[in-house]
Amino acid sequence: MFTRADLEAREAALLPPFARRSSEARRAVPEAPSETRTAYQKDRDRVLHTKAFRRLEAKTQVFLNAPALGDHYRTRLTHTLEVQQVARTAALSLGLNETLAETVALAHDLGHPPFGHAGERLLDSLMRGHGETFDHNSQARRIVTLLEERSGEQPGLNLTLDTLDGLNKHGRAALPPTQRQPSLEAQVVDAADALAYTAHDLDDGLRSGLLHPEDLLELPLWRELQERSGVTSQRPSSADLRTLQRELLGWLIGDLTRSSDAAIAASGVASPDAVQAHAHRLVTYSPALRGHLRGAGDFLRERLYRHWQVEREVYQAEQVLTELFGAFLTRPALLPPRPRSRVGRDGLPRAICDHLAGMTDRYALETHAALRG
């Protein structure tokens, strides 16, 4: 039987000095260590058992109400699990703390509202009308520190400070000296997130028929992928798509780990603090592949995320959330007891926003229909 002390000793023996170690993890509220689990393993398990994590199953990735389109389109939950798998693979390859990377990956999208990025933009717009903002990264941190509860004694999950730091997104590869870079484990999750949604949104777009293989030929990423995979058909079969998806993931993960390993070695960082003080991120793709991914992201925005059929769904989502927000704002008594109890602490607009952000697509539509009668 391996005890927590055994697992921590194994980390000390195997992990390089720039990786995070669970034995050094701290929490805002100290608690007794587990006999069998490391601090990061406890964090991971707490995230997995939250209501917010379970609700990801019925939240949009790209296509609203994806189950109505078919059983194989990705939801926010399947995307999260795919990010977890990529992050764990890359972290292991780079000698990082894979449990911390896995935990941050599982928690990184907890703050997404219903209806995907359309819902996020709409809630942010509504909150700005009340002098506040909304973004899913801040909401994820709010969920694990305030809204979810393990016990009646304190709000939140009391996750380690390392996990909480991993939920703070930093949008630029180079930061001002006053800001610290994320840990390498958190950087891996950011890279895995971009990798997963690029690869899998292309796949879902093709399967939906909103994207066509011939359209993708304008992408250098796709042309090189065809050469690598040997799949050049303009009408790829389901088996061809699986081959392309497998080849794309292997290519991206391989490039990420090789480029990051070289960048870490060249940087000379010898501690987690040195990583966070570094001027640039060290988990990165090769310059060529970074260009390919930027091109793919631009392509997806124009051809898939702004496709007229997707835009119709976005319009419906905006109407639903706008009307729900307005109804709860004018008649707070319509709020269920739990969000209503938070009005005194957080203010009415934020209590409404938290309630709406926690909804699944299905529950938002059902609530909207019920209020309209």
From Swiss-Prot:
Q: Which UniProt keywords apply?
A: Hydrolase
Protein family: Belongs to the dGTPase family. Type 2 subfamily.
Q: Which GO terms describe its molecular function?
A: dGTPase activity
Residue numbers spanned by region Disordered: 21-43
| Protein name, entry field | Deoxyguanosinetriphosphate triphosphohydrolase-like protein 1
Q: Which Pfam families match?
A: HD, HD_assoc
Specify whether NADP is a keyword of the entry: no
Q: Which GO terms describe its biological process?
A: dGTP catabolic process
- Organism for this UniProt entry: Deinococcus radiodurans (strain ATCC 13939 / DSM 20539 / JCM 16871 / CCUG 27074 / LMG 4051 / NBRC 15346 / NCIMB 9279 / VKM B-1422 / R1)
Q: Where is the HD domain?
A: 76-198
